[in-house]
């Protein structure tokens, strides 16, 4: 998948597509290596995407109609650029909103509530 020495894989599972959609929404178009470097830079090296998880995720998003691709030759080597479709832009915003709502819900469960005493009998 992708490695992160600070967080468990289970904690990060399911966020890769949201990360990819968000980056592409911000940058317009990017190629694979550029995406890995942007994630590494923005997370101060806490999340390192591996090709084995990046490209399957990009292909899945493309199959779902969220991404389009264009090939450009750099010298003799082809480079595939990924760009959000209109549906992908909408999906990016939906997923980010959903993730933030989930964070708020987690806080309600995880943060101490005034007047509640956990682990004690009434």
Predicted regions located by residue number:
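Short beta-strand "wing" residues that participate in macromolecule-binding interfaces
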Residues: 69
């Amino acid at each position: 998948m992708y490695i992160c020495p600070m967080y468990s894989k289970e904690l990060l599972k399911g966020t890769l597509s949201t990360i990819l959609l968000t980056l592409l929404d911000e940058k317009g178009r990017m190629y694979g290596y550029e995406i890995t470097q942007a994630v590494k830079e923005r997370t101060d090296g806490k999340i390192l995407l591996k090709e084995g998880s990046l490209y399957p995720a990009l292909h899945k998003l493309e199959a779902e109609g969220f991404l389009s691709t264009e090939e450009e030759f750099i010298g003799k080597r082809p480079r595939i650029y990924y760009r959000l479709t209109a549906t992908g832009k909408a999906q990016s915003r939906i997923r980010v909103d959903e993730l933030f709502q989930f964070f708020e819900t987690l806080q309600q469960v995880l943060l101490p509530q005034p007047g509640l005493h956990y682990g004690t009998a009434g």
